[in-house]
């Protein structure tokens, strides 16, 4: 078994250095009927960078690592897929800017790959999924395409100001897991570094209380980051050896600003709301030392997979979007030692919900069956899998036949030979 989510490895790897080489690689694959799997950094939680079929070729984009343009005034950057968060951070920091980091995604990850796959960003509750603007790439049939200003023949570097809306066709390439083509250049948004940052904690005795509190605080539009974690996840987040002194659930709220007075009035507002909720807004979490600093560190520099895994153990996240009522029903499906994170989306109308399965290495086959059983129950309850894994793709297709019939017709239009990451997303 290659990984929890995939049994296959690519037969070989190619490393293009420019979009022309990407285009030639795709054209050759079409001639030879060879499946391609685009890889930027392999840090996407569900191993979508590994093939779902035999004899695939990995297209390693790590050598395409140029920061084409950085606009500090408008807080945007045009980058290639090999640019990592660590690489982009240095020039951004010099301009007083920062990137929007993703949950579980380390600094060595591709910025473009992370944003294209819509890995959940800590900043989504505040900024929503608008981290990408225009893009350029090569379709699965070998044709070059671009969106917004990048599609125009202007001799200027700042081709990002005319982006795309969520309803436009370009968004099909988001969360597509490389099934429609390869993006070779894209504009991403940046944020200003705030000198004042404050972390607050709100303890909850159950998951129902946690989702209610998340809804209440996100409605104020004051948190820059906000999420809830159960005590298993929380202990790992804070580097604690056990969960004894932690509440069953903790809502974490981060406020940012440019003056201490700004943080002070935000704290006053949030404290008043906490009292209405019959709870307490705290800057400490039990006996944990420097809990707030540890949260800020994890947000700015996520640990990644190793946050949850130890020697001899495995970790498998279940990536979903669900309503509060669906979450409450789903919680009982997971073992007591499971970690879980919930982040409000759309002002609390729904949530990014990431419970997980823990297991000892060697138990993968058994845990796969558990994973699929749980996924089936979640699908029947109406829970959405925004990025299906290779394991549950068929299940997701079976529950959404009309949607995937349309997706297949779109894929056939741009990938007539079915060479781009076949069998991903059930395509």
Predicted regions and their residues:
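FAD-binding subdomain of flavoenzyme oxidoreductases
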Residues: 67-70, 81, 85-212
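Glycine-rich N-terminal segment of FAD-binding domains in flavoprotein oxidoreductases
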Residues: 2-64
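General beta-strand structural signal in soluble alpha/beta enzymes
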Residues: 15-16, 36-40, 47, 59-61, ...
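Glycine-/small-residue-rich beta-strand-loop submotif within the FAD-binding core of flavoenzymes
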Residues: 5-6, 49-86, 123-124, 190
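A conserved active-site cap/scaffold subdomain adjacent to cofactor or substrate pockets
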Residues: 197, 203-209, 243-281
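Short amphipathic alpha-helix segments
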Residues: 209-238, 324-336, 367-375
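Conserved glycine-rich FAD pyrophosphate-binding loop
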Residues: 8, 47-56, 60-62, 273-427
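Short, conserved charged micro-motifs
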Residues: 21-24, 87, 207-213, 259-268, ...
